Every structure is written in structure tokens, then in C-alpha cells.
Amino acid sequence: MLCINLWTSSKQSTTETASPTTNTTNLADSPDIYRNGEQYKPGVGTRQLKENIIYESKGYYYQTDELGRIKVAQGDLRLETGKRNNRDQLKAGYEDRLPNDHGGHLIAKIFGGSGELDNLVAMDKIVNTVKYRDVERAWENALKNGETVNVKIILDYTEANKRPTGFNVEYIIGDSKKEIYLSNGG
């Protein structure tokens, strides 16, 4: 059984450290969770996520907004090698992707995160390879030391843009709660 802790989604303006507060909302408890590829729109050519749904992919939970953009990713991390999907990594962010963007995993492949569009967004290469990666290393080290790691990533967007403007990354390692806000550059 998957136990997921959640926190409030208040954005930290320019701060990179804060303390999340407990919230009882749990995507895993939703009665309507899409699974096994049901999160994609049928017959639209290029795969796109359905709007306003909660879905499970590789043991992690996600929520989309009214435009089919990933708004929340969450779960209890585990060390497990996932698969990379170069095709989907190049598509993440669609027409709003910037030249220096990568297709960044919200839940890294070292934690068994999906390599498909259901876990990828356009992410500035410095954010992806340095800032976000530093947080992932802390999670990886905690797991290797036998600690539990629970994460919730809330994505910010402007208007109808498919490229996130930032990531509110909230996590608990053991009993320690942390929150950072990463601007998506560009």
C-alpha cells in the first residue's frame, strides 16, 4: 500500500528554502485514477495528456490541469532504474520549449520514474542538470541510507504556456520537511 503525505501548495516567491505544512489531500486516494496509458488522449497523433485528471504512472501519482499540463507529481521514492525515452524527452514542452531546455523528468529515472510525456516537462538545462539534480542527489543519498523520502512537486505556469515557469519541490526525508522553489529560467 502506498502512503503519500501532502502539503499545501503555497509558492515561495524567491526563496529556495521553507517549511511545508501538513495537508490531508492525497492523490492516491482519488476514486478516479487513470492507469495503464489511460492518461493519454486517444487518436490525436502526438500523445497528449487528458485534462483535469489524476493518473498513476510507474507507482507515482500526477494531476493535470484544464490544459492537460502536469500540475502535481508526488509519491514515495524508491531506488529503481527507469527507462529513458529520447523521443518524448525531445517533445516535452511542445511549441513552448526554449532552445536551452531539456525534457526533464519530474520523478527521475533513478527512482523508477516514467520516461514518457506523463513525467516529462520542458526544463531549463541548468535547472535540470544542476539545481534539480542536487535535490535528487539528496533524495538518492537518503534512500541509500535507509531513510524514507516522500515528494510533492507543484508546477507553475503562465497563461496557456506548456513550459513551467517554476517548480515548488516539497519533500520529507525521515521526519525532516523541506521546500525549495526552483525558477525554470529562460
Regions found by a protein language model. Name each.
Residues 46-48, 52-186:
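Domain-level detector of nuclease and nuclease-like folds
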Residues 1-53:
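Long, low-complexity, intrinsically disordered regions
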